[in-house]
Amino acid sequence: MGEPAFTSFPSPPVLGKLKRNMMPWALQKKREIHMAKAHRRRAARSALPMRLTSCIFRRPVTRIRSHPDNQVRRRKGDEHLEKPQQLCAYRRLQALQPCSSQGEGSSPLHLESVLSILAPGTAGESLDRAGAERVRIPLEPTPGRFPAVAGGPTPGMGCQLPPPLSGQLVTPADIRRQARRVKKARERLAKALQADRLARQAEMLTGG
């Protein structure tokens, strides 16, 4: 008896090399989540940025400055608001009254003293002219003319200008006198600044 003939079956055609994923399932899931997030970030980055301040500032904002040419956008109710004032500093400045070198309260300068300081030789003449013109003024008001108001400007005063100060001689005594005045004024200013600083510190301590 002969040997049975060997029958071979043809193998199916191989379409490609089979690939097997060696990555664990948990790691593969994490990789898919990471890739999905990266894809969403790329899609969001490609869009134009959104102005988040448009929902806050609905009107154009202008800077407020004290200049006549500036136009500030404001509401109708803001027109009647008053500017804030520093009341404490204002009261301290009111308490600081001008005083003389002896510490006494100084009164306002009169016209005669001002003229004597500016031009000692012409003070009496200008006052005499002013007195003469005051005598000429009629007591009863005339048509088209009003009498001088009490406390107002007196006719004739200020019309006579003093001569220039270049013709006056400055002596060493005048220089020393002026230096003493400047020194006393600086001392008063230093005392006032020190009092203001102490008052500010007291306000900060009481307010805090």
From Swiss-Prot:
Source superkingdom: Eukaryota
One CC-aspect GO term: nucleus
A GO molecular-function annotation: methyl-CpG binding
Gene Ontology process terms (BP): DNA methylation-dependent constitutive heterochromatin formation; negative regulation of transcription by RNA polymerase II
InterPro entries linked to this entry: MBD2/MBD3_p55-bd, MeCpG-bd_2/3_C_dom
Note: The MBD3L proteins are encoded by strongly repeated regions of the 19p13 chromosome. The exact number of functional copies is unclear, and some of them may represent pseudogenes.
Family of this protein: Belongs to the MBD3L family.
Name of the protein described by the UniProt record: Methyl-CpG-binding domain protein 3-like 5
Lineage: Eukaryota, Metazoa, Chordata, Craniata, Vertebrata
